[in-house]
Each structure stands twice: as C-alpha cells, then as structure tokens.
C-alpha cells in the first residue's frame, strides 16, 4: 500500500518513493547537556512511529540518529562542572538510552557522536573555503556565506528580502530575525571554552552545531537521504543550514522528504523551568506513571498538531491502556472451545486491519488508527458477550477466533509499541486444575470448586468467574 507523507519542503502530502533499499533515515538526536525532556520525546516517539510504519509496510530502514556532545550548552556545562566534555556528557547519554528503552523506542542502526567526526568536519570546512563559500572572519571563526547558496530559505520558505540580515552570527541557535552567515568553526575562547578545543588549519576551536549533522549523516548514509526528521523548531536555522552546507559540498539534493513534529505544550503553555511545568521522563516515572502510559500519550495525537500534555491526559492514557490490557487478557483466556475461525470474526479483523493501514499510510494518522482499534475492540467484546457458555454450539466464540485476533494485535503493535501482552504462559498443571474446577462447577460441587481455586491461587495464579467462563491471570 502506498505511503503518503507531508513534506515540509514542498508543503504538500507526497507519495513516498525511496531512492533505494534500504530507506535512508536520519533523525536529530539529543544534545547531551542535560536529561531529555518530554518535549524532546514527543519528537522521538513521532520518529519511532515513522520508522515502525516503514518497517510494517515492508521497507528496510537504515536509521542514523546523532548525539550532539559538543556545542554551546555542553561546553558551558563541562566548564561549570570543571570536568572533561566526555565525562560531563556520558551520564546524560546513558540516561537517554535508558529512556529510549522505557518508551519502547526502536534503536537506530548508528548513534554517531559529533566529537568522533571532527577530522571530517575540518576537511569539509576547508573544502567550502576553497570554493569561496566559507570564509574566516575577523574573530578567526569560519562562516558560511548564505549569499553563495541561492536556494537558502527553501525549507523554511523564507523571503530573504523581507528579513533583516546581519553580517554573521556565531551562536548555535538563533531565530529568523537574525538571518545571517552562520558559523562552521567557532574560534577558541579560553574564557568561554576552558581547555576544550581542537586544532585545525583555521586555528584552535570547535565545529558549529549545524555542520555536525551534515557531516555525520553524509558519512553514514551517503550524500542524499530519503528522509530527515526532527522537531518543528529545527526547521530554521538548523535544517536550513544543513541543506546549505550539504548541497554545497556534494552538489546533490540533500534530502527528499523532510518531516517535522509540532510543539508539545504542558497545560496549554510552553514548557519552561520557570513556570514549573518542565518534565523529564524520570519525573513522570517517579509520579507513578509507566513508560507505556507516557508513550501512549505522546503517540496518540497527529505529529503535525500541537500536543497538550496534562496530568488528565496521562490518566486517560492509563485508562486506554487498561482497556487494551483487559481486552487482551480476555482473549488470552485458555478455555474458549476449539472451533473454526468464524466468518463474523474474520470479517471484523479484515475490516479493522484495512482501516488501520489506511490511517497510518495517510501521513501517519495515528489518532484515526487508534479510533479504529477501539471500534474493533467494542465489536469483538460484543461478540463474546453475546455467546452463551451453557450451550456448546458452532456459533460460540472459539479459541481459534481469540488466537486470530491476538495475532492481529501483535501485528499492529509493530506500529504502536504499547500493547500489554501477557509475559508468562499458564503452566499445564495449572490448566489441568482449572479444567477440573470447571467440571466441579458444572455439577455444582462447590466445595471441590473452592478447594481447586485455593490450589490454583497457591501456585501463583488468580481465577475469575464470569459469564463467558473462567479467566486465569498470574498474580
């Protein structure tokens, strides 16, 4: 089935046509000066959804996510703490990978560190200087001359003539009001940088943030990428500058599809420490929420709309996951009768899968996909509720029906990454005790049924009697 994605470059939804196999995917990773916050993870969960959808549709994916371990913020942090850059960044790198696991985010194929690619960055800067595209400023930093790149502003759709343009800027982050030549190599300042610098033909210093991503992506994925994704804040200046650098070096189109997720708000406001609404994943885990609950909340809205993160939203995510957990537990009941997959169940499964795939291939419309999932759950629960456990008829919901649905749920969880499947099978000896208890109940031998219940509990399993039969769960 065709996949359609909204391309920031064209501002249109386009059919995805990869250049080759595998799909070359580059996503902006963390700047490891602190713990990643939930706004960062909104973007990372979106990028994970994108990757999962590609894999679900049968594409092979070569995914690279960078680790920015040298920039204004990391240098300031290391200097303040009085330690090496590596020692300062490593705890935050470790925490980032732990957070990825907690949120069920698939690992990338490579996580290049900016500090490992500085020789390649120096070589690229020299090439740009030789072409007359970059120059050494009076402050001994090296700058990219945006006037030498005619397509500058194409991604962010800037009208260069309407914007105030200054001569140059050496900060890593700035806004559109400061459109200017940007830094490729920041000259060493002992008062600012301490003892952290690299030698180069242009003098001591370190690379600019924008150059780092260009060099690492091209080193590991080649000169032209299929997809580059990140947050909307990265469009300008970061991704705009990446295009200018990369295409000046390669003389080839840098990226075919640009995807960007929108902002995350907290209680309707921009997240900030001063407002007291700044959360890391660790903060939420300490409040008693699970990684699955946080992932579900970050996942459920369309990536190109703002997501309002609230405590009420987390509670709603918890309830949604409970509904999913209860449904799966109901299907995992081992005491449905053996029978065929009934046409009504097969038809419901097929209709649901078609609706789910139609949604995710329409620019990753996960909210529509989740709506179809809960419609499906209501329909199947209705089928199970209608069955009569007293009459063994061919129309009764069967074990094969349940297994077919569970298989389908496992299939779509390749995209969602949140479904709570049971972690332990029920041992045969416990199943035998349950069957004996079921037989005792049918002949109204309540004393024996109670004894068998106690025996089952003693083996670490709970048993619930319901109108559709008995359910067994590990305690």
UniProtKB/Swiss-Prot annotation:
Organism, scientific name: Chlamydia muridarum (strain MoPn / Nigg)
Residue interval(s) of motif 'KMSKS' region: 270-274
Family matches, as SMART domains: DALR_2
Free-text cofactor note: Binds 1 zinc ion per subunit.
Reactions catalysed according to its record: tRNA(Cys) + L-cysteine + ATP = L-cysteinyl-tRNA(Cys) + AMP + diphosphate
Any one biological process term the GO annotation gives: cysteinyl-tRNA aminoacylation
Annotated Gene3D superfamilies: Cysteine-tRNA ligase, C-terminal anti-codon recognition domain, HUPs
Subunit structure: Monomer.
InterPro entries per UniProt: Cys-tRNA-ligase (IPR015803), Cys-tRNA-synt_Ia_DALR (IPR015273), Cys-tRNA/MSH_ligase (IPR024909), CysS_C (IPR056411), Rossmann-like_a/b/a_fold (IPR014729), tRNA-synt_1_cat_dom (IPR032678), tRNAsynth_Ia_anticodon-bd (IPR009080)
Family: Belongs to the class-I aminoacyl-tRNA synthetase family.
GO molecular function: ATP binding; cysteine-tRNA ligase activity; zinc ion binding
Protein EC: 6.1.1.16
Pfam family, one: CysS_C
Keyword Nucleotide-binding carried by entry: yes
Cofactor annotation: Zn(2+)
Record-annotated disulphide pairs: none
Gene responsible for this protein: cysS
Main location: cytoplasm
Leader sequence residues: none
HAMAP family: Cys_tRNA_synth
PANTHER family: CYSTEINE--TRNA LIGASE, CYTOPLASMIC, CYSTEINYL-TRNA SYNTHETASE
Residues involved in Zn(2+) binding: 28, 213, 238, 242
Keyword check for Nucleotide-binding: yes
Protein name: Cysteine--tRNA ligase
Keywords linked to the UniProt accession: Aminoacyl-tRNA synthetase, ATP-binding, Cytoplasm, Ligase, Metal-binding, Nucleotide-binding, Protein biosynthesis, Zinc
Transmembrane region(s): none
Annotated localization: Cytoplasm
Gene Ontology CC entries for this record: cytosol
